[in-house]
Amino acid sequence: AALLAGFNVVLIEMKEDAAEAARGRIAGNLSGALKRGKITQMKYDAMTNTALEVSINYDSLASVDLVIEAVFEDMGVKKEVFGKLDAVCKPGAILASNTSYLDVDEIAASTSRPADVIGLHFFSPAHIMKLLEVVVAEKTAPDVVATGFALGKALNKISVRAGVCDGFIGNRILATYRTAADHMVLDGASPFQIDKALVDFGFAMGPFAVGDLAGLDIGWATRKRKAATRHPAERVPTYPDKICEAGNFGQKTGKGYYIYEAGSRGGVPNASSIASRSRENLARSSSGGRLPALSGRKKPCLL
């Protein structure tokens, strides 16, 4: 998205092979735009050769104006990365997190410059999906917030301001939607039936295909993080965790609820993904499948 908007981009990966794979994925996405006539060959060449730098060295970020962190959804990992960014990036550089759920205030507190820290949460795939959540932490400076919205406009996104809360806006809504789908699976439906019904109704994708696209490890990390405070009567499916425990995180690993051939975004149902689904919680809830209304959420997510 940033390349298409005319920005120079520095991409940091952990290892050389991962860096080259990332470059290949970006080139693949841009080649699609080239084939559709959205960009010229000259622009494609400039974006993939001149405007894009791929590195495994954080020092490559020393002169950038804004960094968007998009590492694994784990607070310890996030803090480690922000510590490195804090040490390397120039004074005044904005440090943004693409976190889906985590506390941006806590991330900001791990740096010496909390006023420069903000959440910029994109939705998958980031070069297509329009929504951008601009998550304002307690100490985020007003000019940093303004820059977040300016970036969203430059990227042709619909930017919304969000407060610091679990899942912000989009994922709080999605969580209730996904809970309903999980309860249907516990009651005997398959993920593939649910996805098909929603696509037939007019949705671009069903919730399980969306999970594969975003990465099943994100939801897995969230479920583990919330386990200690979960109500004992809550109906919690175990089949998504079993998929993740097998190392299957969706499109990024080639297998999740669906199986994906190399280079393909379309998958075929993975029957083994639900072979061990559990109905152990069927009798544990007397709610009859009713879900808490979104309006009943106590903590505000808008500012």
What are the roles of these predicted feature ranges?
Residues A1-L303:
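N-terminal glycine-rich phosphate-binding loop for ADP-containing cofactors
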